[in-house]
């Protein structure tokens, strides 16, 4: 039993050093809790930070954008605008479709938002057109969020109408029921229907009109209640053959009599089984397909949702015929899992590098084992807290743990180094542990709480960026806190049991060589420090120059928002002239698809043409390009995009816009490019005046590329100008005119066929094959007051005009969205400033407002708060250090080291060609916490030497620098090597991790060199300042 000296109190570590069994069991409990917690943690790409978003889609086939806006979108918007918690409301009204996207405040639960939306739809129902085929349908999904999974269903033996029917009833409904799925859309529009194509000449010859035919069909196909007979003993349900199920039955339907002879529908029309909408189509690798896109609910875990779908697929596909093939074209979780695996590997590599550094400095296996146990214990214990906080294993939390390897080992290194020093002086291990741990306890507490103080401002960041980094900050803070506990409990206890003077002095050739090298380095540092202390003003000039340089670099460095990730999926928009038809777009997409599929990096391609909830106009097509895995292709996604755009550029009449999908989706609408800027006015006329001017100005800016807008007002429209007096004289109303046109050209859904499994529509239209274009209007006939038929041309004049293809609103006012990318050599910050300058140059009137949207708006907000965030971190750290040291001066000395970290980080980012984005800023904030640790270790020992040994300030700080040089070098290298795997990351998701590593490695390299010399000089400067203040104000001395 070792005899303890009277002064060996051990501080807070004493109990744990003297009770090794209890300490071991306590640490085992932390380890076990962490292992169990890890098993329950979900896996995700990023923390769940989605805005509660709901999309409301209303389809009204045949309606123009004007009609959709006034009769459908506007009534809905008026009701939605009264909902509490609504952050933003945008809408898009195009031919036959109205899409309203509602984004709510982050604090509003999605289920509450859903209830409000349903109530608003109910309130608007009476204001909507009475002949809407279906009421508005809402989905808990962000339309800008790319599908988590895309499946293609093809068949070489069955028509697409049958394939869609089976997919809709047997597959899509089941997938929709999976927890986390927000919306399952079937692109391709091949819903089965009975199509009735009227022969205009035939019905005109018989004196009939399309309205006569429509009335006959709707009256012949009904499905309503008929009652029952209730007798004394038996009840009989009434039924009838009131339903027609097939095209053959409709063909035989009698619609009128001529001279006593029946006129059947087949006599005046082509009746066939077809698709409900013939202007919709989807292709998978150029083959006709039903493309199933699965989108998650905002906030749902993408990995868990995708796993549930994968488990269901084999069972669902078994119910389909053998000729129907289901192919998973894309699964976003594949890249997410790969990214998480790469980050986990980098975490393990960081731990290995840190342990290697410890061994290199200590050159003792028992001394290396101690921090080697402390590091994984601190990290694993963090998982237990993460479970209780509902966190996930994602790129940001794993990055926090990777960075934490350099942080958590610092405490253990400081404790071990201090205890080892006493053992080498001849102290018994137990006494050395008590003395060393007691002496260093306050330093550990100072380091821990000052470092956590740096993270506090991250917890109070607003909006989506704050939510995004909350898990990062809390995970890192928990790891640091557990590390402090381990370092004050387990580490000194293990030192007391595992270290001895003999083991520490046991050396081999490698140990002796390392020792000689360290001795020479420390001696050189001592000589250099002595010279620096003799020339303090030169050193202070260097420190001041560093501060100025950091400010200058901050102003000039390119700034961005969030790194552009290579997730292996590209979303695209194909744009054609505004007058393009469905047939021409289908032909164009075939040409484009052929070029894209020839690229060696492309694995699969899906394309979609037609108007629905996702695609606003006929002259645009949607594409999803799935790339081969990163290790199977030579180029990153940006190089592939450039190559594809070059390949398609030679196809006449098309413009291809591509952008890589991202894990972080802030936008609420699908855009052609990565960034958006809106121009809003009170009227469409005001927009039509300013949109071309602003677009031309933006297209001339070198800071922007691929500038486009969704303003399309050159679509061709046939204006039917009815002579109301003539129509009234003939007994023809405007409703008769609208009905006749709708019957002929609106793919009008006039009746419903009910079956046990699904409902199908009867579609009425004119067969325009022999009378294309405006000539088809000459075939329209209307019924006059006397029962005769009148050609439309007798009461109307047809004019061809230009009309908008879609009308967009933002918060109920007309808006145009400009989309743009940032070319190579420029940053998002450059682009934003160029747009703002252009806006000032144009001198827009007061009733025209502009605003950045999505990630560009978030960038503006983040950029505005970044400086305050760093200031808040410094202030928080000053307050904590001031409380711990009971001094106003010493915290300033410690914080004087911070500019060196900023200079190193910013220079490293510039050299690496990386932008100063949110990830890099987080790295700089963490550097503030790391770099000040060097100063804390120096100043703590200097103050102790002055207080306990009576040394002069100069001798005290000089000795403290030499004594603390080795642990400072160890902890800095440990932190640097913890960040090194992130900086050198090349796998999936490396774009997200690399800026953090670059900033930290650069900052640590520069600050390590400078702070070792500037800190002692600044310490002596403030010491003299403190003496001067006391001499001028003796009252301070008396109070002290």
From Swiss-Prot:
Keywords: Cell inner membrane, Cell membrane, Membrane, Transmembrane, Transmembrane helix, Transport. GO terms for cellular component: plasma membrane. The chain crosses the membrane at residues 15-37, 345-362, 367-389, 396-418, 438-460, 472-494, 535-557, 867-889, 909-931, 968-990, 1000-1022. One of its GO terms (molecular function) is xenobiotic transmembrane transporter activity. Its main location: membrane. Pfam families: ACR_tran. It comes from the Bacteria. It is a multi-pass membrane protein. Gene3D superfamilies: Multidrug efflux transporter AcrB pore domain, Multidrug efflux transporter AcrB pore domain like, Multidrug efflux transporter AcrB TolC docking domain, DN and DC subdomains, Multidrug efflux transporter AcrB transmembrane domain. It is found in: Cell inner membrane. Belongs to the resistance-nodulation-cell division (RND) (TC 2.A.6) family. MdtB subfamily. Part of a tripartite efflux system composed of MdtA, MdtB and MdtC. MdtB forms a heteromultimer with MdtC. This is Multidrug resistance protein MdtB. It comes from Salmonella typhi.
